Amino acid sequence: VSSGLNNRVDVSHYRLAVHLLIAFFILSLTFWDYLKLKNIDLSHRKLKFYLPLVFLILVFCQITVGAFVSGMDAGTIYNSWPLMGSSYFPDDNEFINIFTLTAFRDPSLVQFFHRNLAYVIFIYYLILVYKIYRNNLIRYFFPIKIIGLILFIQIILGIFTLLYGAQIYLASMHQITSIFLVSSSLYFLYLNSNSK
C-alpha cells in the first residue's frame, strides 16, 4: 500500500501548529461551556476586560511557537540557558533576520522567539498580579496564584527540556502542562467576563 510519503517522514511545523491549535480551541470551547453550566457568580468587581484576554492570547501565541519548536526539533539546539551559546541572541544568526519572512523557518530563531515570549508572558503575569492586589480584587487572588504556580512549573519544565536536549519525557510534560495553563487562563478570563 502506498503511504503517500515522498522521502520525507517529518510533519510540517505549520501543519503541526494548526493541528495543535484546533485541539486547543476545541478544549477552550468545551471548558467555557462547562464553566457556563457551573453558574459561577460573576457579580464581583473586575479588571479591565482586555487584561485577561491579552494573557490568554499570549499563551496561545506561545503554544503556536512551541509547536514550531517541536516540529523543527529546535529544542535540540542551543541547549543552554539563559544564553544561546555564548550570547543572548543565537550565534548562528543576525538580529535583522527576526524581521524577515523566513524567520519561522529557522530553528534557532524559533527557539529565540519561544524563549523570549516566555519572558513576556511572565512579565505580563506580574503586571496582572500587581493590578489585582493593588485594587484588592479578592475574587482573583486564588485564580491568579494557580496560574502563577502552573506558569512557574511550565517555565521550569521548559528550561529543563532545553538543557536536556528535548528528552521526550520532559517535552511531553512541558506540553501537557500547557493544557493546565490554558484552562486556568480561561477560568480567569471567564471570571472577568459577563457571560450568561
Where are these regions (language model features)?
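Polytopic transmembrane helical bundles with strong interfacial aromatic enrichment
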Residues: 1-196
